[in-house]
Regions:
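A membrane-interface helix-boundary motif in multi-pass transporters
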Residues: 185-206
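C-terminal transmembrane helical hairpin of 12-TM major facilitator-type secondary transporters
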Residues: 76-127
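Transmembrane alpha-helical segments of major facilitator superfamily
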Residues: 51-59, 170, 174, 205
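Extracytoplasmic gate region of multi-pass secondary transporters
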Residues: 11-64, 124, 128-129, 181
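Intracellular juxtamembrane helix-capping segments at the cytosolic ends
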Residues: 122-155
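Multi-pass alpha-helical transporter architecture, strongest
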Residues: 201-226
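Helix-to-loop junctions at the C-terminal end of transmembrane segments
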Residues: 62-75
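A late C-terminal transmembrane helix in Major Facilitator Superfamily
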Residues: 145-191
Length: 226
């Protein structure tokens, strides 16, 4: 209900996972929107719309793999390594951009983005699995010493409700964040003549997601290991 939605907005786990979910789900949206424009701008001799569907298609296909891996290895660890890949891929794409005296490499550029799309897809699945586990775990801890099965079941229901509310809110935040990617490309090109600045910025953002995942959820003594 509305009360649960309002309460969850004040929860720090809500904002942590919104940050990470923006890195995966938001990136999927933004990359899909911005990739054709970026290729056509940097490699004008190529019609990017002939193959622009490949990245989003691969991301959608591998999303279930992220959930499957999260169930077996742990969502936080999968998400951590996904953000490692996502931090490197934009720098690789920037390396293959055309520069003065060089035509760049379309193949290298596209492959770097394919890696970014696949990582975003897998990470979308793994972060999606993390959210309900986080809130269920926190609620279970509150009644763990009561030795009361009814209290435990009630706590799990509350955790499930909070997890569902967080998924909805995080999805909205991530979708909004996804619109930033094409805007960042355009701004970088307008100011510097190249999207390289935007790509470096994205790499730094994914690095922050990687470090956040490790600190909050992946390390052995994390607040909520999942």
């Amino acid at each position: 209900g509305f009360a649960e939605q309002v309460a969850i907005v004040r929860h720090k786990q809500q904002w942590r996972m919104s940050w990470l979910y923006t890195g995966t789900f938001g990136s999927f949206i933004g990359l899909a929107a911005g990739f054709p424009m970026l290729v056509n701008t940097e490699f004008p001799a190529v019609d990017a719309f002939k193959f622009a569907f490949i990245g989003p298609l691969l991301a959608a296909l591998v999303r279930p793999i992220g959930g499957w891996l999260a169930d077996r290895v742990g969502g936080a660890m999968i998400t951590f390594w996904i953000f490692v890949v996502m931090a490197v891929a934009p720098l690789a794409a920037a390396y293959f951009l055309p520069r003065a005296g060089t035509e760049g490499s379309l193949i290298g550029f596209v492959l770097a983005f394919v890696a970014l799309f696949i990582a975003a897809g897998v990470g979308n699945g793994s972060t999606f699995r993390m959210i309900p586990i986080i809130f269920r775990t926190l609620r279970e801890r509150e009644v763990a010493n009561q030795n009361d099965q009814a209290a435990m079941e009630a706590a799990r229901r509350v955790g499930s409700t909070e997890g569902a509310a967080t998924l909805g809110f995080s999805s909205a935040v991530a979708a909004f964040g996804g619109f930033f990617i094409p805007i960042a490309y355009g701004t970088s090109i307008k100011l510097t003549g190249s999207p390289e600045g935007a790509l470096v910025f994205f790499s730094v953002f994914y690095l922050s997601c990687m470090l956040g995942t490790w600190r909050w959820y992946a390390r052995r003594d994390a607040e909520v290991a999942c």
